[in-house]
A protein has these predicted regions:
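Walker B motif beta-strand of ABC-family P-loop ATPases
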Residues: 54
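Hydrophobic positions on the alpha1 helix immediately C-terminal to the Walker A/P-loop
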Residues: 6, 10
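Post-Walker A helix-loop "phosphate-sensing" segment adjacent to the P-loop in P-loop NTPases
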Residues: 11-24, 34
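Short, small-residue-biased leader/transition segments that mark boundaries at the very start
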Residues: 1-2
Length: 160
């Protein structure tokens, strides 16, 4: 969630400063790419995902790509290289990208070479905010249940 929130904040700031922005969930975006797959890349330059100053791709690596999808992804990255900015949110480390990109280390290397040239990589580590909220909610429910049964809070904590 933090990744997406940060990406949206950066995209919003870009819009406020007059830049064009396109935001896609990668799985949904792949559907569009497959439809455009037979079109020559130069004819795609007016597509939103090619022409935007900033392209935000959310949830990269949630599902592995087929060879066709990985090649289409390369085509977009290659076309946009040094023409527009791209933000990619992912929970995958760079070392696991070949596995996401149809197991093709050469293709992954070519994509990463273009993406990482002049890039800023934010590696955010820590516990999931969703899980943190769930744990807090479960702890509150447990305390409420103990209270309704008349168990003092100190005794409840001691049993944990």
């Amino acid at each position: 969630m933090l990744f997406r929130s940060l990406a949206i904040a950066l995209a919003t700031r870009a819009l406020e400063n007059g830049f064009s922005v396109s935001y896609y969930n990668v799985d949904e975006w792949m559907h569009q790419l497959k439809q455009d797959g037979a079109v020559h890349p130069m004819q795609l330059k007016h597509r939103k995902y090619m022409a935007s100053n900033l392209l935000v791709l959310d949830e990269f690596g949630y599902q592995s790509m087929s060879r066709e999808e990985a090649n289409l992804f390369f085509r977009v990255v290659s076309y946009r290289y040094q023409k527009g900015s791209t933000i990619i949110t992912t929970n995958k480390g760079i070392g696991s990208w070949p596995g996401v990109l149809a197991g093709d280390e050469v293709l992954a290397g070519a994509i990463l070479d273009r993406l990482l040239h002049s890039a800023t990589v934010l590696n955010i580590q820590g516990r999931s905010y969703r899980l943190k909220d769930l744990e807090s909610s479960l702890a509150n429910q447990s305390q409420a249940a103990d209270k309704s049964r008349g168990i003092p809070l100190e005794e409840s904590r001691a049993s944990c």
